C-alpha cells in the first residue's frame, strides 16, 4: 500500500491542478497533505485549504521540534509538510497527495516516508514563463528567480 504520492515540479507547472483533479475524481482514495508556508496569502487562497500560513518564527520552532517531514526555503520563503498533515490523511485510509518542490523531494527521500514520486515538467520554459506571468503574482525579479530554479528542477526531475 502506498501512503503518499509526491507531485513535484517547478512553480506554475500545474501540480495543484493535477492534485485537485485526482481528489475530485477519486475522493475516497486521495486526500491533500496541506503544507505550511511563511509566504503571504495570494488572492483566493484559504487557510488550511491551499496552505497553512504561518510566521517565520513559528515555522522555525516547529521545524526544530521535528514536526516536519520536509521543509525547505524556496524563493525566499519557508515551505514544509508536517507529520500531522500526512497523518491526518492516512488515518482516514486515503493516500496523501503532496505538492512539493524539488528541495522538498530531496528531504522526503531522506525521511522515513516512502512515497511514490511523480514529476511534472512544463511543455517548455516559454510556456512556463507565460503561465507565471499570467498569474500576475510575480515581480520581474521573482519571475527570473523562479525560471532559473525551474531549469534546475527540470534537470533534477528528469535525471533522478
Model-derived regions, located:
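P-loop (Walker A) phosphate-binding loop of NTP-binding proteins
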Residues: 8-10
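Post-Walker A helix-loop "phosphate-sensing" segment adjacent to the P-loop in P-loop NTPases
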Residues: 24-32
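Walker A/P-loop
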Residues: 16
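Conserved phosphate-donor/acceptor-positioning beta-strand/loop module used by diverse small-molecule
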Residues: 96-101, 111-134
Amino acid at each position: 500500500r502506498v501512503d503518499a504520492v509526491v507531485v513535484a515540479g517547478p512553480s506554475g507547472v500545474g501540480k495543484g491542478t493535477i492534485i485537485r483533479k485526482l481528489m475530485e475524481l477519486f475522493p475516497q482514495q486521495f486526500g491533500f497533505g496541506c503544507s505550511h508556508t511563511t509566504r503571504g496569502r495570494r488572492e483566493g487562497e484559504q487557510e488550511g485549504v491551499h496552505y497553512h500560513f504561518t510566521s517565520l518564527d513559528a515555522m522555525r520552532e516547529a521545524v526544530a521540534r521535528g514536526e516536519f517531514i520536509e521543509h525547505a526555503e524556496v524563493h525566499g520563503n519557508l515551505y514544509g509538510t508536517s507529520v500531522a498533515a500526512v497523518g491526518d490523511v492516512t488515518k482516514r485510509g486515503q493516500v496523501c497527495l503532496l505538492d512539493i518542490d524539488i528541495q522538498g523531494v530531496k528531504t522526503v527521500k531522506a525521511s522515513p516516508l516512502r512515497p511514490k514520486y511523480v514529476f511534472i515538467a512544463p511543455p517548455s520554459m516559454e510556456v512556463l514563463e507565460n503561465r507565471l506571468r499570467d498569474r500576475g503574482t510575480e515581480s520581474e525579479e521573482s519571475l527570473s528567480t523562479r525560471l532559473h530554479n525551474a531549469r534546475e528542477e527540470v534537470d533534477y526531475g528528469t535525471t533522478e
